[in-house]
Amino acid sequence: MRHRKSGRQLNRNSSHRQAMFRNMAGSLVRHEIIKTTLPKAKELRRVVEPLITLAKTDSVANRRLAFARTRDNEIVAKLFNELGPRFASRAGGYTRILKCGFRAGDNAPMAYIELVDRSEKTEAAAE
């Protein structure tokens, strides 16, 4: 029985899953919108939202926690210098998932996951 087991396995072992979501979280923070499968987008939301909440309070300890979870100084800098102040007045719900059809090869449901208040330069780059 799978009672009280949260999270999706996504046909990966735990280290592969952790590395995949670490990379996807970095891409989402860097580009502010990415396209992926719907189940991955729903799980990625559980990784990215706590990072942004952490970035709302700038301290050395929080920066070290964010680095431990992302392993990328560029991502940590963007989280604390841009995203933390941008979402300071928002109490959660920093991401939006938009369904965008099905993948041609295997008919997997696809989705865009984006930060809700994207900056203008990333909106122009996405179009």
From Swiss-Prot:
The keyword Ribonucleoprotein applies. PROSITE patterns: RIBOSOMAL_L17. GO terms for molecular function: structural constituent of ribosome. Pfam families: Ribosomal_L17. The keyword Ribosomal protein applies. Coiled coil: none annotated. Transmembrane segments: none annotated. Disulfide bonds: none annotated. InterPro entries: Ribosomal_bL17, Ribosomal_bL17_CS, Ribosomal_bL17_sf. GO terms for biological process: translation. Keywords: Ribonucleoprotein, Ribosomal protein. SUPFAM superfamilies: Prokaryotic ribosomal protein L17. One of its GO terms (cellular component) is cytosolic large ribosomal subunit. NCBIfam families: L17 (TIGR00059). Belongs to the bacterial ribosomal protein bL17 family. Part of the 50S ribosomal subunit. Contacts protein L32. This is Large ribosomal subunit protein bL17.
